[in-house]
A protein has these predicted regions:
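Membrane-interfacial terminal anchoring regions of lipid-handling membrane enzymes
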Residues: 1-511
Length: 511
């Protein structure tokens, strides 16, 4: 079950599996890809085409379930994309659970062989459809796949860099059900398979676990690392020496304090990675008497945001710690742990993160010490007195800036509008995010994406930071803590801008 970045995923994964000496899987593909001549090629490569929706067609659904069951009974592996479609933002999409539910229902037929799910992370230094994604995010309708599109793609072929394929920790469905639903075998019937009450919740939990394991196997590369650095800088540009220094910082951080042991980090040096990235002709190089400046063209900012989103979750905790250290200059281990404990559950919901490793914070801070950015004496932590140290921590801290601003909009509105209805909060938060984006030139699509905002509000409820009653939504004391943290972490001018917008909108709603 891979993530879905591009139509190239079909070929890359199948090709890799074949060259590992394994039997390529049957592939569930959207019916939109069944056109001449691609359809025949895909079908001969193992694809079977399915409709986007089975709603209202019980016969089609029943026939497909039987087909899927027969594949499993005969021991064939099956590949399907749990996101249901290609991500247009670079973030993992919320999982679609239909195929996974059918897989579990097939097990309830009494299949006498174990079934395992293998989560797969796929990443690229260039996604062929990226310009199409940007047009769709800008509001253009999605165009159907066609022969003309194939010829255009062939015509535009060039050095697209490297593709990355990482296998996450496999999940044994039998073992999962034994642990989570010990009585699942009582629902087994060879012909008359029903939907037991536990099926829906267990499918949802299993789907989330798959997504967590995909993101735990992310691949860092030259393009997404440079995007992480350049996008947070003014004019999206940085001198070559400073860029290399920050890149070295990130490489050391990920090698010594990786979010997961499945994450892959390039073996090359910072200079080699930059040289490779420049060969892809994605970055502008501006030379003057002081040296070279590496820049992202302003028109392509959204494009690079896609690549940054592939790996932003790997920097979530280090970025929050760096921002806290930059703002406070002095802190304690207890304060760092309290900060991460408050925000990590929110990050985990948004980016499909695994449970926090109790040693992760210590490893990140130790990496900062190794690079002479901070000093630790007992429980006390302070940053070293150098401009270079401040610049590196500030740059890393900025990686979470837009995420925290989005949080501040929602939390601020709840704090000033106690009793607001959930639907109104979702709508008003999107309006406020769009306004803030206009004022500050924020063009990142997910900043004001309603689905992302709705997901955050759901996360607040799950964490019991808000309660929903007949009188509307009410924030808890813990939500006040989040509010105060955000106020301390965000730049004063940004916070003031958010606060002004929230207060104005709240007053407008009352009137």
């Amino acid at each position: 079950m891979p993530c879905h970045r591009s139509h190239m995923d079909y070929l890359l994964l199948t090709y890799s599996i074949y060259h590992l000496g394994l039997v390529p899987p049957h592939i569930a593909a959207g019916i939109n890809l069944n056109f001449f001549p691609a359809g025949g090629v895909f079908r001969r490569s193992g694809a079977f085409f399915i409709r986007r929706s089975f709603a209202g067609n019980k016969l089609y659904s029943s026939v497909f379930k039987e087909y899927l069951s027969q594949l499993f009974i005969k021991g064939y592996s099956v590949k399907f994309y749990t996101e249901g479609g290609r991500s247009r933002t670079g973030r993992l999409l919320p999982p679609k659970t239909g195929m996974l539910a059918m897989t579990l229902q097939a097990m309830l037929r009494g299949i006498d062989r174990p079934i395992s799910i293998v989560p797969v992370y796929i990443g690229y230094e260039h996604v062929m459809e990226i310009n199409t994604y940007l047009k769709e995010l800008a509001g253009n309708d999605k165009k159907g796949e066609s022969v003309l599109g194939i010829f255009k793609a062939i015509k535009n072929l060039k050095n697209y860099g490297r593709g990355y394929l990482n296998f996450g920790d496999p999940i044994s469905i039998n073992q999962y059900l034994n642990e989570q639903q010990p009585d699942w075998r009582e629902s087994i019937h060879p012909t008359d398979v029903q939907k037991p009450q536990w099926l829906g919740p267990q499918v949802a939990n299993l789907a989330d676990k798959v997504m967590v394991n995909i993101n735990s196997a992310a691949a860092l590369n030259a393009v997404n690392l440079l995007a992480m650095i350049l996008l947070v800088n003014d004019k999206h540009a940085l001198s070559k020496p400073k860029l290399i220094a920050q890149l070295e910082f990130y490489l050391h951080l990920q090698r010594s304090a990786s979010y997961s042991d499945k994450v892959t980090t390039p073996n090359e040096s910072a200079e080699q990675l930059l040289e490779h990235a420049l060969k892809l002709n994605k970055f502008d190089v501006i030379s003057d008497e002081f040296g070279e400046i590496i820049a992202i063209n302003d028109k392509e900012k959204t494009l690079f945001n896609y690549y940054r989103n592939n790996v932003l979750h790997l920097f979530a905790v280090p970025s929050l710690l760096a921002l806290h250290l930059f703002k406070a200059h002095k802190t304690t281990m207890a304060d760092c742990q309290a900060l991460i404990a408050r925000f990590y559950p929110l990050f985990a919901k948004e980016w499909f993160l695994h449970e926090l490793d109790e040693n992760y914070i210590t490893r990140v801070l130790a990496s900062f010490v190794d690079q002479d950015l901070i000093e630790i004496e007992g429980d006390n932590i302070k940053i070293t007195n150098s401009n270079d140290c401040l610049a590196k921590l500030e740059m890393l801290g900025r990686a979470l800036s837009l995420t925290l601003q989005r949080y501040a909009i929602v939390v601020g509105f709840i704090q000033t509008s106690s009793g607001i209805e959930r639907e109104e909060l979702e709508h008003e938060s999107q309006v406020l995010a769009e306004r803030l984006g206009t004022l500050h030139g924020i063009k990142t699509p997910e900043f004001f994406d309603k689905k992302v905002l709705v997901g955050f509000i759901s996360s607040l409820r799950e964490q019991k930071l808000i309660t929903e009653t007949e009188q509307g939504l009410t924030g808890s004391n813990e939500l006040c803590e989040v509010y105060l943290y955000l106020k301390a972490l965000l730049p004063a001018r940004v916070w003031q801008s958010i606060d002004d917008i929230v207060q104005s909108q709240a007053q407008h709603a009352k009137d």
